Design a protein with these regions (language model features):
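Conserved hydrophobic beta-strand within the GNAT/NAT acetyltransferase core sheet
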Residues: 190-192
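Metal-cofactor-binding active-site regions of metalloenzymes
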Residues: 1-188, 197-205, 209-214, 220-237, ...
């Protein structure tokens, strides 16, 4: 029997797609809500993003001049966090991983205060969903300092993973070793943004150097058979964000998106939103775009969905 998700893709039925359980495992918390939801809450118009944002800098500029303009400050950050959980409810996201920077946690106060606040949203909107908080650090940070302070954030046991974002090849992978070694003490999943702009070789070296279990983006691994075999053999999960890649110009289009090559070479991939508020494509739409473009079959997309849920 065909499941509701496969039916939804083949019939172009949004309600069926919304009702099927899904995951979102690469989600920047302060940009995790829908534009429509936020506009309604603030009672303002927020314009649609252009089809192409010029790289990471273009993305930040658009965010500053369109979102921050109407939604800045502490209370509005909380509102955007709330919106991410509201979206999990609307889209039946039964496994949600969101990342938070230490500066964002610090704004709330203690880690315990942060946990209470986030769990209140979790309980209100999607109590049955598995939620995991991920701690993300900027690639330009002072790693020694961050490693020394990691205990403060990790000892509560609330954060399940560690990540580096905000631009690749800013420091050599070895520079992050103190932080990733410290993360092992708390059994944190080790992840990193790599292979979005960086090379296939970068992806492999990051995994080997830091002992990553997952890679955020990782699409440029598709240019190397060796790297893809390495990722497949070592069961490294690659959390792909199609609309993000296309809009930022890191993938040409949906039809030729590198996810196709990764899947065909046995790499374990998941499909995610990255920054929903910016890229304006909610999780069911990410699957639908890839299906409509002929990138992957409904069955392949369903397998990816199941993997994200932890069923495979």
């Amino acid at each position: 029997v065909e499941n509701i998700f496969v039916e939804g893709l083949k019939e172009n039925n949004i309600n069926k797609l919304l009702s099927a359980p899904k995951s979102d495992l690469h989600n920047h918390s302060t940009k995790g809500c829908r534009r429509e939801w936020l506009a309604q809450k603030l009672n303002v118009d927020i314009s649609k993003p252009p089809q192409h944002l010029d790289g990471l800098e273009g993305m930040q500029n658009w965010f500053r001049s369109n979102i921050k303009l109407v939604c800045d400050g502490y209370e509005n950050m909380l509102l955007r966090w709330e919106g991410a959980f509201a979206e999990a409810k609307r889209n039946n996201i039964t496994r949600l991983v969101m990342n938070f920077g230490t500066a964002e946690v610090d704004q709330v106060g203690s880690v315990e205060a942060f946990r209470k606040l986030i769990e209140e949203f979790h309980k209100t909107y999607c109590p049955d969903s598995i939620f995991e908080a991920e701690l993300t650090y900027p690639s330009f940070g002072n790693v020694e300092e961050e490693a020394a302070e990691l205990d403060k954030y990790a000892e509560e046991g609330y954060f399940k993973a560690i990540d580096i974002c905000a631009g690749e090849n800013v420091q050599p992978f070895e520079a992050f070793l103190p932080l990733y070694k410290k993360a092992e003490k708390y059994h944190l999943n080790k992840k990193m943004h790599v292979g979005e702009t960086g090379s296939a070789e970068d992806v492999r070296r990051a995994v080997e150097t830091l002992g990553l279990s997952e890679v955020h983006h990782g699409i440029n691994a598709s240019t190397s058979k060796e790297t893809m075999r390495f990722l497949a053999d070592n069961h490294i999960q690659v959390n792909v964000c199609p609309s993000s890649n296309v809009m930022l110009g890191f993938a040409k289009d949906y039809k030729s998106h590198p996810i196709k090559t990764l899947v065909e070479n046995g790499v374990r991939v998941t499909i995610n939103t990255d920054d929903l508020l910016i890229f304006d494509s909610s999780i069911e739409n990410e699957y639908l775009k890839l299906y409509k473009s002929g990138t992957l079959s409904a069955e392949q997309l369903d397998e990816i969905r199941q993997r994200g849920l932890g069923n495979l």
